[in-house]
């Protein structure tokens, strides 16, 4: 365990968030999503499980570390309430048709599957840049 990192974030999830660059996409999905099949086609190449966690809780944990991209009009596809709260600002969300979402997911950096059983609860987050003060 480390200070300041949500306990729901495994070492693998933190590792993937660190590997991602700005503009990379991260998929967070429910258990109904064909995640294992699609994850094989992502940059990371394998599925990451976030067991025991629903999508709102998982998204909040991930967004506690990962900034959203501010250089694109819609850095998120789906789920407004959790994203706005984590970012502290209103975030435009893009809506994608089911099969268009699957294609976009294949181009993502990685896929994290939660234990959420709600249908079509998946979304994509585009990573932004952390603005650090100069030393």
Feature roles, as predicted:
Residues 38-71:
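A phosphate-binding glycine/aspartate-rich beta-alpha loop in the early core of alpha/beta enzymes
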Residues 22, 67, 128:
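Residue-level marker of positions within ordered structural domains that often coincide
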Residues 24, 45, 68, 88-91:
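A structural micro-motif
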Residues 1-51:
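Long, hydrophobic N-terminal alpha-helical segment
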Residues 7, 11, 49-56, 73-76, ...:
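Electropositive phosphate-/nucleotide-binding environments in soluble metabolic enzymes
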Residues 12-19, 57, 61-65, 78-81, ...:
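Alpha-helical scaffold segments in soluble metabolic enzymes
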Residues 75-135:
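Glycine-rich, aromatic-bearing surface loops/beta-hairpins
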Residues 26, 67-77:
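Hydrophobic beta-strand segments of well-ordered beta-sheets in folded domains
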């Amino acid at each position: 365990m480390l200070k300041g990192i949500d306990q729901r974030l495994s070492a693998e999830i933190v590792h993937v968030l660190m590997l991602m660059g700005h503009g990379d996409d991260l998929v967070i999905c429910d258990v109904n999503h064909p995640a294992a099949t699609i994850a094989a086609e992502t940059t990371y190449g394998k599925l990451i499980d976030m067991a025991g966690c629903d999508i709102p809780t998982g998204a909040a944990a991930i967004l506690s570390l990962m900034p959203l991209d501010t250089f694109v009009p819609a850095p998120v596809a789906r789920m407004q309430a959790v994203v706005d709260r984590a970012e502290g600002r209103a975030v435009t969300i893009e809506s994608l048709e089911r099969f268009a979402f699957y294609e976009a997911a294949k181009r993502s950096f990685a896929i994290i599957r939660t234990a959420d059983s709600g249908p079509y609860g998946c979304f994509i987050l585009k990573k932004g840049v952390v603005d650090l003060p100069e030393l």
